[in-house]
């Protein structure tokens, strides 16, 4: 299955609670932090909630979906 690289590009200051929790669920903690997630409906739904705070691109290479952690 395809993977997505999700990078937080804007701050969570002043955003709604649901958006902040969606970022945490994706595993994003700070600006310029990236995670690789499996491309599925759940992930797409979380991205839709915070689309103005993140950048999404297809993951390239031998990347595998990872749970939080530092990249």
Curated annotation (Swiss-Prot):
This is Large ribosomal subunit protein uL30. PANTHER family: LARGE RIBOSOMAL SUBUNIT PROTEIN UL30M, MITOCHONDRIAL RIBOSOMAL PROTEIN L30. NCBIfam families: rpmD_bact. CDD domains: Ribosomal_L30. Keywords: Ribonucleoprotein, Ribosomal protein. One of its GO terms (molecular function) is structural constituent of ribosome. Part of the 50S ribosomal subunit. It comes from Mycobacterium leprae (strain TN). Pfam families: Ribosomal_L30. One of its GO terms (biological process) is translation. Belongs to the universal ribosomal protein uL30 family. The keyword Ribonucleoprotein applies. The keyword Magnesium does not apply. GO terms for cellular component: cytosolic large ribosomal subunit.
